[in-house]
């Protein structure tokens, strides 16, 4: 078997090798920078942080699940679009931790919803439909009937504990937006 000679001139070969080296450096730089940003983000969120609340203003499920969040720090509005395991309802409020050094860097805590006016919610009973628990995520799904309409809701909890499928639970349902509901236990300590 004979290996055919290429038809490239020495100058063309050199240019091809330079392009390969350039693209390799560019690719390496991209992954290094991405890794640096991830580490920098972790560092900024591990120390010198504050907690405030954020409002869900939109969501997207095109390639991945993303919630659009808006929060305010020292009179300045910030918007973030973190990846999420679930789509939450527009108008919900959650706790968000942000870096004091760079308030654009934040992390939402979906296990801590915020209710500003408890009078806007009714307490009713719901039935646990399913539970999911892993090392990083605990999801409780429940069904409820509000004003003769059936609703389903997934919420993220720190731990599922003794909540089992079929158990009856007390939930809080938003009177104007019944799709928004929470496990009453999430607010017992407040």
Feature-to-residue mapping (PLM):
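Oxidizing extracytosolic/periplasmic lumen-facing domains
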Residues: 1-190
